[in-house]
């Protein structure tokens, strides 16, 4: 038997079937960085329109987690797709370097608290620690395939950046937005520092829930005011409800709502003043079934009336009025401690009630409050206070309530509101809040709800507390008058001098300042403040300093910010406020947010649960491209699920794309684009369709990239690779590619189409499957750029002429017909009427119009349906036992088993020449010894 293998153009390629990504990717990375790929991209894009995605700085502490990977990969996909779309899209990575977590790590390493270490020495240790963490994280980010200007990353601890943060603060001071005040702010008892809203997380907590009866100071006067004609000798009480009994020592008033209706309720033991709408609920909680209504009145009547503190002697609590009192729960009256609540503080200011500062920075009561409370920690005080209330016979009810409570984002411990003297930015000064809300409307928010979310946050947010009582951070650089506490009148000029020092020495310069040299003769009249700025102020200022890296990127604002959905109250907000303060405009045109990574059950990743997946482990086992594909396949606008099963599905998708590329590469192994490319007008019709289909897909994919709809790209790619190419085009062209003459125009036409398509395909996947795209690029024949990443979308694809007989509509109908025939043949094979489609002689019954069109294709029609013979007949001549199509009207199919012999070379059942020593069909003789088979259509 003759071996015809050597007469066939069988596919060959060194592009392996097995990806071995974990082994190949490090080598690819080395090549990128040995050749400074990022610089090559920038050189190629010089002069193009800038697209600047401003990198939100991750914190320089610990290993990267899966959320970091999602964030960096999404950014990298966008940057690469923008470069591919004709933009100059740089990527300058950022890091947030100051802050408490680094302080704590350094304290652990040194075995000392920062207070016991010389500040400048401690800061240098923190700087070294941050550098080490950045080096580690940078390596991991690069391993993900993220291309950027890693050697010139933006670090908040760079001396110039530290100086610029001080410069920004100086501008804010000049505009009179900064003020100092003692007011309640979130305070962490572990950090010993104030916290911003962005540093707060809410978790469930069990708290003591108590109803306390607060006795009227003068029953007689109160009865007169309320026109109460009753003989009852019972005292009148104004009950309050609280879940923070420890705040009662700081209580200075009781607030009621002026417009609510209140009633005096007589019970067996007390006369209670309650909001009318809450009476039934309170009685139910107190388990009181019988009561009488003695009087009704508006809350405003109670203003100024005095009640006695429930357990502190000789302290009266006046009734004040406040709109914040609601009917959601409680009694309609709120005990008011301006030290421990923003609403309490605001309402107290109207009545000139000042804070008392009874709780120190560790959460302990100061002395001289009550003998049983002196020096006691507030969280141990609840039991003591409840016992005091019981002894005073004013505890109406006590139970344990589970509710959402603010916690420190670092320590995961409950925080408190504590009145301390801090520096604030006035959000309402010069209509800043209003202007910011207006600016939000000009930004494109993706998803759209992001705009509504930050808008609500801006509406409700308090003034920004920007001061912190720590050491590793940018100092506020203020000189305060010892008597008045006012900022030095020449502080702006002084800050300019300090900025120059910080640019040379870093923040450490502030702690080295000689006051006499700096202030001259007035030095002994001023104190140097050592408060540092909130780290959110630092990261929120990063958009103002990118220009130092490259002046051409210093446009008015970034094109995009992209972070997790928690950053609406974090970096998005701090950046927005600072930009409004300094430039009176938003720092971004677009803001894109992604969800959090959760496990397959929707649970948040947690070490304690044991459901975490490390990006480094995924990269080591499956490769960076699988992780990138998982990110791109996910609908990132919601929470993103990950598990080994989900990653396996990503691997399956990857395999389909890789195998499609491999098949294409294998079939152009002998193709020289400079010599063998066939012009459009000379191409086989099917090849023209394939190129036009690729053009349509490219247009769709470009639009998906433009809209950041990456999972739609993967879905479209899969359909293109599996159906339009795999099940249709690439399956059909095998016969022409393998059996025709090597250098025939028909075969080179097919190779031209494949070459064009894979040139487009490699660009489509480059932003997502970057390592694989690079590998494909290096296996493409002909001359081309060194890297796909310097290129733009492939521009040699073309469309079909819509006026042509064989236009898109023709191919759409033909593919529908093929799909129906495929189902028919599958049934025939299943019923064992034939072994495979090449044993079939198909007779198709169609309308006269369709018959006329299909007959133009002649003998080539069989290659579309992968059969050895096809006949076209009129629909009305179809035999009774023919199969009617369910999808296509006026279309029937009939099958006859082929009578001809099978050709051992092409496997078609064909005509043979008698006494043919070659034992192959006439078509194969023509292709091996003759001038070759002619193809025009398929």
From Swiss-Prot:
Reported cofactor(s): Zn(2+)
Domain of life: Bacteria
UniProt xrefs under InterPro entries: aa-tRNA-synth_I_CS (IPR001412), aa-tRNA-synth_Ia (IPR002300), Anticodon_Ile_BEm (IPR033708), Ile-tRNA-ligase (IPR002301), Ile-tRNA-ligase_type1 (IPR023585), Ile-tRNA_ligase (IPR050081), M/V/L/I-tRNA-synth_anticd-bd (IPR013155), Rossmann-like_a/b/a_fold (IPR014729)
Bound cofactor: record note: Binds 1 zinc ion per subunit.
Localization annotation: Cytoplasm
Short motif ('HIGH' region): ranges: 58-68
PROSITE patterns for this protein: AA_TRNA_LIGASE_I (PS00178)
Substrates-to-products reaction catalysed: tRNA(Ile) + L-isoleucine + ATP = L-isoleucyl-tRNA(Ile) + AMP + diphosphate
Gene Ontology CC: cytosol
Binding positions for Zn(2+) per the UniProt entry: 903, 906, 921, 924
Binding positions (ATP): 607
Residues where L-isoleucyl-5'-AMP binds: 563
UniProt KW keywords: Aminoacyl-tRNA synthetase, ATP-binding, Cytoplasm, Ligase, Metal-binding, Nucleotide-binding, Protein biosynthesis, Zinc
Pfam family, one: Anticodon_1
Motif position, 'KMSKS' region: 604-608
Enzyme class, spelled out: ligase
NCBIfam families: ileS (TIGR00392)
Known partners and oligomeric status: Monomer.
Database matches in HAMAP family: Ile_tRNA_synth_type1
Function: Catalyzes the attachment of isoleucine to tRNA(Ile). As IleRS can inadvertently accommodate and process structurally similar amino acids such as valine, to avoid such errors it has two additional distinct tRNA(Ile)-dependent editing activities. One activity is designated as 'pretransfer' editing and involves the hydrolysis of activated Val-AMP. The other activity is designated 'posttransfer' editing and involves deacylation of mischarged Val-tRNA(Ile).
Name this protein carries in UniProt: Isoleucine--tRNA ligase
Phylogenetic lineage: Bacteria, Pseudomonadati, Pseudomonadota, Gammaproteobacteria, Enterobacterales
Gene name as annotated: ileS
